Amino acid sequence: MTTVRIQMAVLCSVLTLLGCHQSMMQTQSNQPLGIAVQPVRNESGWGGFEGDRATDAVVERLARGGSLFVPPADRVRAALTDMGLDRARTPAELDRLADALGVQCILTVSTTSFDPYPPFVVGLEGVLHERRNKQANPLDPVRTDASPVDPGAQPAAALQAFRAGRVFDAQDADTASDAKTWARSRVGHDAPLREMDSYFRYAVDRLLEALMASKPNAGM
């Protein structure tokens, strides 16, 4: 009788563990994709470039619609400061930053060219790093029962990179036409060929669309 009770207790424990695991996996699958935006890098040579304003524009665009979890720019800057960095560069740094912010992806955007006078020129490059298999089985009984392990000894998660880049030159007829088409659905930014702020947001939109197209499960 005692043996039967022990077996039943073990079975109940296993079922409870499996139930918790399934519930956790369902919760994780329902969570929106998290993307943190690093401060935009100015590689254009233009000294008057406003990096914080550019970063805010990228964050605002990604957060629009609510389908993604996008930490505020000041929170990302604070996390980088805590790490002693101006931006994350190596896979290990990107992994640490993603952990600190609770996201799966880190987006780095650079301006490669910038002319703030009409006809505007904005060159942008973006790299979206996504972590893969950070923890394949969070309730692995072997790992759960193991003695504590130094986190620093754990290998960094594999990173997959998605890249996109383009120079948006308003002198190009196709680019100018596309900017006008974009403006028709943007309240408050209806003059991208006359206002640099609107033109930069147009360029950011098109860059992010290209990046998300290369990552089908992202959505935006």
Which ranges hold each PLM region?
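N-terminal secretory signal peptides that target proteins for export/translocation
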Residues: 1-4
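Bacterial N-terminal signal peptides
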Residues: 7-18
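C-terminal/domain-edge helix-coil "capping" segments
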Residues: 20-31, 117-121, 132-220
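Envelope-exposed proteins and targeting segments
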Residues: 31-34, 66, 102-107, 120-125
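Acidic/histidine-rich, surface-exposed loop or edge segments in extracytoplasmic proteins
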Residues: 32-44, 74-79, 182-187
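Solvent-exposed coil/turn segments that connect beta secondary-structure elements
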Residues: 40-43, 75-76, 111-114, 125-134, ...
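N-terminal segment of the mature soluble domain
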Residues: 45-110, 154, 204-215
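Solvent-exposed loop/turn segments connecting transmembrane beta-strands
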Residues: 46, 113-120
